[in-house]
Amino acid sequence: MKIWVDITAPAHVLVFRPLIQLLRERGDEIEVTAREYAQTVQLLELHGIEAELIGRHGGRSRLGKLGTMATRMTGLRRWARGRHFEAALAHGSHHLTLTARSLGIPSSTTFDYEFATLQHQLGCRAATFVVVPEAIPPERLERYGVRPPKLRRYPGLKEEYYLADFEPARSALDALPLDPERVLVTVRTPPDVSLYHRKSNRLFPQVLNHLGREENVQAVVLPRTDEQRDFVRALELPSVIVPEQAVDAQSLIAFSDLVVSAGGTMNREAAALGVPVYTTYGGRLGGVDEALIREGRLRPLTDPRALELVKRDGDGGRVRRDPSLMLELLLPV
């Protein structure tokens, strides 16, 4: 089978890495497109995935997103036409599902946050199948035109599938000036450029200021953009480390005592790896986060002083799942 995969954000590289490997092992031909956004290209190179770069992120404004979407879809259509794809796969890329539909290619999209309304109104309606975690109530997807048999659901977190074969490498942290006696906290900045996260996260700067002045803490901050990196460095907080280059984030999480994240992927990676994690997300919580909070695997944070800054003992209950199940659900034919 000839399959097209479109990757539009760094996390999508991690999701599709084991799936692409499984497809190639069974003899399928895979071609990948990607857009330039954050560390997407770096991660593709790190994992040895060749991709055709088409388009870039549209920035904060809706007008910018609309313009880059039109340009990118034109580029995708021009690239894909005549390649005779039998299936197209994406993680939330409405660019792919819309383009695939216009070319008559069956497509599947997957996501784990149901309130990215505009994105899902476009992407879900164009897709042949929509694959989501069981934690998302099906009725929340009906407004996007998603019902069985179009709807396919999987147990657990997507991170439990793509991290199934992951073993953390302590050597990945050698470039960081870490003191093993201090509490290691991994901190992820808010997704301020995301369309569904329109308001700034007021809690996050308070958390950063609190951690950055704790003498028994080392907070490794992983910014999403150069602008965020410059902002954090300018604060000159004594207990904050901002890596000069991209780091193995999954290994960093695995060896951390605590994770504090304003996004979603890193929260769920920590939960999958059994690491205590707090969310400072300022938007509406989705079904996955709601389930993790009920299970005690994710803690909502409203006051930085509530952080339990202690050394961790043990793996906290890591969960692994077979990525072949995810692949079976995604394949639209």
Task: Describe the residue ranges of each PLM region.
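Conserved nucleotide-sugar phosphate-binding/catalytic loop shared by glycosyltransferases and other
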Residues: 24-68
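Catalytic binding pocket for nucleotide-activated donors in carbohydrate/polymer assembly enzymes
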Residues: 272-316
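A donor-sugar binding/catalytic signature common to diverse glycosyltransferases
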Residues: 88-99, 109-110, 252-289
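Donor nucleotide-activated moiety binding/catalytic core segment of transferases
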Residues: 72-79, 226-262, 266
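Catalytic donor nucleotide-activated moiety binding site of glycosyltransferases and closely related
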Residues: 47-60, 208-243
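A conserved, positively charged/aromatic
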Residues: 108-110, 117-132, 253
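C-terminal amphipathic helix plus adjacent low-complexity
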Residues: 314-333
